[in-house]
């Protein structure tokens, strides 16, 4: 796109389509400027019938507003949409006194968010004030909801394992809701793998990182019964994934050369 539009950064590029009345070539589908990614995608798509990673992703926790306003009526004036916004947004930590620096009771849970200079911090809140978003009571992997620029192969900004009773604000999304830490460690290794991030890069063309961008990343079995040995290193797991999806040497070399390593 920079060749046609000088000094302009168009994240998704520019697609030029031609029409030939004499040919029927079918729909474009998901467009990628890399031929290797298109061929990898064709090999992976049949496996998506078994699930994709976006199906086990969970957005931020939400407030139970009735409970919150019963104890903190002043919060209604500080919550957007005339006090109807239920999502725990990035600014909730600084605006609402229901969040505390220290645990105030055995029923309090920790919430991961961003403080000054976008530094990651945890604050406490009584559990009765928040809904269970589907993974609050279980292990999960927490990743930023916005990351990088959308370039193929970028690293994810410090994904981490969230223990049970840890939630998160709108700045993050959670992957998985599993009962054991070993399963969460397997998920963490998977999202660090070059293969998974290559598949993510097909749909992620901006910094935004919502669940739908992970729709082409095939779901895996993260238990000990998996066909992938999750006890191996991330690079060794990549080799297993390349074999599972039948990638050619050319396709493997493309991923290895275009996707940055994460350990």
Q: How would you label these PLM feature ranges?
A:
Residues 250-263:
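Short, amphipathic C-terminal "tail helix"
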Residues 3-169, 176-249:
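C-terminal substrate-recognition regions of SAM-dependent nucleic acid methyltransferases
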